[in-house]
Structures are given as C-alpha cells and as structure tokens.
Amino acid sequence: MNRHVIIVAGGKGLRMGGDIPKQFLPVGGKPVLMRTIEAFYAFDSSMHIILVLPVSQQAYWKDLCETYHFALRHDIADGGETRFHSVKNGLAYVKGEGLVGVHDGVRPFVSREVIAGCYEAAQTKQAVIPVIDVVETVRHLTKPGSETVPRNDYKLVQTPQVFEVQLLKEAYQQEYTDAFTDDASVVEAMGREVCLVQGNRENIKLTTPFDLKIAEVLI
C-alpha cells in the first residue's frame, strides 16, 4: 500500500521570539525540519514526503538543504492561509490510493513505533490519530471561575494523523471553518469516527524557547 506524509511547516515561530521560523532552527546542529523528514524516511525510505512551506520560505529552505547537504527526496507544496488550506495544497500532490499522514513539521521526535502504529491501524480503521495521557490536573474555565474535570476523560493529541487517501481528500472538500483545528476534526465533521492509538511523550511540538531546551536533551 502506498504511503504518503504531508509535513506542514508554515509557522512563523513568533512565540520563539526570533526572526528565524521555528522549523528552521537548529537542534543538535541540524534544522528541526530536516530531523522531522528523517524520522519518516527512517521508517520507510520509499514513503512519498510532501513538505508544505510558505512560498516566501521556500528559497531559504533550498539554501539550507545545500548548506547541510540534505538530499532526502521530497516534494514542496505552497503553504496556504491557514493550516487547513496548507494541508489541502499538500493533498494535491497525493495521487492514487493508499494512506496519507499529516504531521507537524516541528515534531521531530515522533518515534518509529508511533509512525508504524498509525499507518498500520489506518489500513483497517481509515482514520487514526496518536494520543497520550493527560498527567496534570485539568481545570475547565467557567463564567463564575473554574472547576476541576476528570483528566482520564481527556487525551492530548499528536501527529502524524493518518487516513485513507480518498477519505481525507473528500473531507478537505468541505468549506473551511475555524472549528477545524486538526485533520481529525475535518474528518469528524463528515460524521466519520477516528481511532486513537498510543503516541510517544517525546513527540513534543517545538513552540517555545523552553521546548528547544528540551529538544537538545532529547537528541
């Protein structure tokens, strides 16, 4: 079965507090985005990798690839106005049947086991997302104040989120709404169920300077 992955890297990295978008920042001497691509290539060297980048960042990425002698094969799609539109642009590069994952470009520490688990489960479940347990106490904000909620009723969602190709393409024909916070929410809007599989806690989304410090430890 053909495997594809759309790696979305359209963030400006404003919470990092610097001028360089977070997906290009070095971790362990190599840009984050290269490590993310390598994680999927290590799982399946024949996987079709589609990188979604804003047009304004594509020349910079190509320069980085030359500087770091990064030659892993991948297509580049144009980033859109929102994540939804970026994924939709990436889907245009996916041909035929098979499975397609969507992964955050700034999650370089996804494990081989999680990638394998998502794609394997999607062969029968068609829509799969990795999750991890909530370990902190969770409070729900209300008009009077806040209240504790049972944390066992909640999960933290990660990527890659993996789907049967035609299912995800059909889902992305829907009109965009701001309720679409990830790919699972787009598929669920059609009334389809999403299967949960175990993620890995190291699969953090690098968003803040503190996250980069954690990343250096994880290398």
Curated annotation (Swiss-Prot):
Transmembrane segments: none annotated. Pathway: Isoprenoid biosynthesis; isopentenyl diphosphate biosynthesis via DXP pathway; isopentenyl diphosphate from 1-deoxy-D-xylulose 5-phosphate: step 2/6. Catalyzes the formation of 4-diphosphocytidyl-2-C-methyl-D-erythritol from CTP and 2-C-methyl-D-erythritol 4-phosphate (MEP). The record marks 15, 22 as: Transition state stabilizer. The record marks 151, 205 as: Positions MEP for the nucleophilic attack. Belongs to the IspD/TarI cytidylyltransferase family. IspD subfamily. The keyword Oxidoreductase does not apply. The keyword Metal-binding does not apply. Keywords: Isoprene biosynthesis, Nucleotidyltransferase, Transferase. It holds the Pfam family IspD. Gene3D superfamilies: Spore Coat Polysaccharide Biosynthesis Protein SpsA, Chain A (3.90.550.10). It catalyses: 2-C-methyl-D-erythritol 4-phosphate + CTP + H(+) = 4-CDP-2-C-methyl-D-erythritol + diphosphate. GO terms for molecular function: 2-C-methyl-D-erythritol 4-phosphate cytidylyltransferase activity. Its EC number is 2.7.7.60. It comes from Phocaeicola vulgatus (strain ATCC 8482 / DSM 1447 / JCM 5826 / CCUG 4940 / NBRC 14291 / NCTC 11154) (Bacteroides vulgatus). InterPro entries: IspD, IspD/TarI, IspD/TarI_cytidylyltransf_bact, Nucleotide-diphossugar_trans. This is 2-C-methyl-D-erythritol 4-phosphate cytidylyltransferase. It comes from the Bacteria.
